[in-house]
Every structure is written in C-alpha cells, then in structure tokens.
C-alpha cells in the first residue's frame, strides 16, 4: 500500500512516498519556487542519482501534478500508476483548538481550517491550497490532515492562556497553541522506548532546533508547556524569527519609523533572529564558522541563542516540579550541531544535566538515536532524529483502517522496542564503517 505525504508551503511542496506493506520510504522530494518563475522539482530515490527538472508551476495544482508525473515516470518514477496511491496525508500548521488528533479531510474540516487561517497567515493559506490541489489531482483517495497544534491540546489552561483580557480568548481565540507537534510526538514516544518507560510515566524536555525552533515540556507523556505561542514567532531565537521580546517593542518602532503592522510582521518573522543579529547569517553552520573566525556578531548571535535555550531548560525543569528523565535534542541543528548542544547544556550540572564532550562530538548522524550524557548524569541527554513524515503516514494509514485515535490511546509502530527504520539502519551501517566509535553512543549500545 502506497501513502503519499505532502507539506505545502507558500512557494514549495515537499513530498514523501511510503510503502506501508514494506515499511519503507521509496521516494522523497520537493518542488521549489511554486507560483514563481523557474519552478523546479528535486526527486530522490535511494540508490539513484537525484532527478532535477524545471517545470512551470504557477499554482500548487501544477506542483502536485508534477510530483505525480515524476512518481509515475517510466525512467525516474517509483510507481507504475497513480492508482497505487491509496491515501494522501497533509501537514497543516494551525488548527487552533478545533482538533486534538489527525482527521480525514471533509468540506467541513476545510472550512474549519479557513475559519482559523488568520491565526496562521504565513502557513495555513498554503496548506489549504495544497489540500485543494491534491484533491483535484488525486480525487479518488482519502486525504488526511495532520496538524502541528494537535499534540499540544493537552496543555493546562495555566500553560496556554495569556494574561490579556479574557474577551480576547473567547472572541478571537487568543491563546498559546504551540507547533512542531508531530516532531514532539515522535521524539517523546521514542524517548519512552529508549528510557524503557511507559509513555504516561515519561517526563522529558525536548528541544526541536532547526531553522524554526521550539521546546516542549512533556509531563506524564503529554505536552504540558511549549515555547511557541499563538503563532510560531514566540519562544526561542530562530533563523529569521525573533522569539521572545517585549510586545511594546513593535509599538515603539512603529512610532519611530512609521512602519506598518505588515512591515513589523515581516521584520519580526523574516528579518530577525540570527539574520537580524548578524546581518547576513541564517544557517547555524555559517554562524558557527564565522564565530570561530572571529566574527563578533556571529558570536553574539550564538550566545544569545543558547542563552535562550538554557532559560527554557531551567523553566521547564521548574514546570515539571521534578528532575526530568531526559533532555532530548532533535531537528536539523539539534541532531547535527554539537556546538549548540554543548553550549546549551553548559552550566546546568547543578540541575543534573552533565554532557560528555567526547560523546557530543561523535553525535553527528541522522541515522541513529544517541546518548551524549556522562555515565553518571542524573538526567540523560539524548539526540533523537525526528521523523514527522512517519507520524503523518501512520496517522493516515490508521485513519483509513478505522483504528486511529488520539495519541494517548493509540500505539504507533515506532513505540515497539524492536522497531527499525530500514533506511536509517542502512545509513548507520555506512556511518559506522567511517567512524566505528559511533557504536559507543548509539542507544541501545552496539559495542556491548
């Protein structure tokens, strides 16, 4: 059974094709510059050279058509006919508090997404266009929506409410929603397996650090608090987003410069964060390289980012009311940047967080779950490569089968202690050939 997952942005459509019967990813790719000149698809199949082709995509419909034609192409495709695709899963950023779990897309569901798109103006319109485009191109199969906000619907009111007039919540749905929920769900469930705990007994703090970044306090296996707010702008310092700042800053700059609300929105979302501090860098690799070459602003950006992460670590230890079982790093930077991890954990020994420098240096792989804490650290420090697409695929499959439920009453395949990601296992084998010492930090240990 073939399941297609789509992640539609304003100018891109990312996709993955999963063979559920074989439990294997058979293709991934992205169409970039959608709605712009020079639209191009990059199609990746393990064991083959990447296929790159330009093709006009004035709308998301043409982008989905391009994906389907590529998947079924006699030379570069992976399926013989579109009819082999039995369902499509769609990532949806913002569903407010309307859904606590993934759903099959119906006209009423789409209307709900439209009704809350003001809460996610940078993402939701594109998500909706992507769903409509895919339904037009592949009309005969179920389409399912997997929402970033659903995971966080377990937060208590004291965590999600803002100290603003209650009327704003009641009339305009102003509250903390949180994002990266699919990633947090996956890493929380995998952490429980690694820790050999039941999900409902697991208390951890997760740092999802990519270009977008947020943290989640997981108490008794569910989201208890998170750093992003009504939009993804709040919280950690990100590639182009400012994260936490005094709201009056916007009013001050508007009075001083005459900037509009739209100008401020664009600046705080797309011209701030690491880019705003350094004036030129968004990628952490560039920041770290420049910092090591003496760039003072790159050093400042790095120090500000990790200071913010440490503050949230401390806050969430307090919110848990107990020592966490583990700190978990995930997403591109969290999985690969040992400098950020080391600095984020520095000075937290009094909280029971003890990083092993050698292990941390070794942990640069997306093909294995690793442990980078010292052997005597009261709090374990884990690096768990996220797999949002697998959650999307599994939710979609379970919805088709009628077996799906909210995550506290549903068991995922990756919660099985014997679960193996075939592609990552093959990648780990190659990694170990290059660096045998990696076996000493993989969990469970491979050198014993």
Swiss-Prot record:
Gene3D superfamilies named among the record's database cross-references: 3.30.420.40
Ligand binding (substrate): 91
Residues reported in the UniProt entry to bind ATP: 14, 208-212, 283-285
Reaction catalyzed: acetate + ATP = acetyl phosphate + ADP
Keywords noted in UniProt: ATP-binding, Cytoplasm, Kinase, Magnesium, Metal-binding, Nucleotide-binding, Transferase
Feature type site, description Transition state stabilizer: 180, 241
EC number: 2.7.2.1
Record text on cofactor binding: Mg(2+). Can also accept Mn(2+).
Catalytic residues in the record: 148
Compartment list: Cytoplasm
Cellular component annotations (GO), alphabetically ordered: cytoplasm
Superkingdom of the organism of origin: Bacteria
Pathway: Metabolic intermediate biosynthesis; acetyl-CoA biosynthesis; acetyl-CoA from acetate: step 1/2
InterPro entries in the cross-refs: Ac/propionate_kinase, Aliphatic_acid_kin_short-chain, Aliphatic_acid_kinase_CS, ATPase_NBD
Listed GO biological process terms: acetate metabolic process; acetyl-CoA biosynthetic process
Binding site residues for Mg(2+): 7, 388
Gene Ontology MF: a single term: ATP binding
Cofactor: Mg(2+); Mn(2+)
Protein's job: Catalyzes the formation of acetyl phosphate from acetate and ATP. Can also catalyze the reverse reaction.
NCBIfam families to which the protein is assigned, alphabetical: ackA (TIGR00016)
Self-association state and partner proteins as the record states: Homodimer.
Family label: Belongs to the acetokinase family.
Name of the protein in its database record: Acetate kinase
Organism whose genome encodes this protein: Treponema pallidum (strain Nichols)
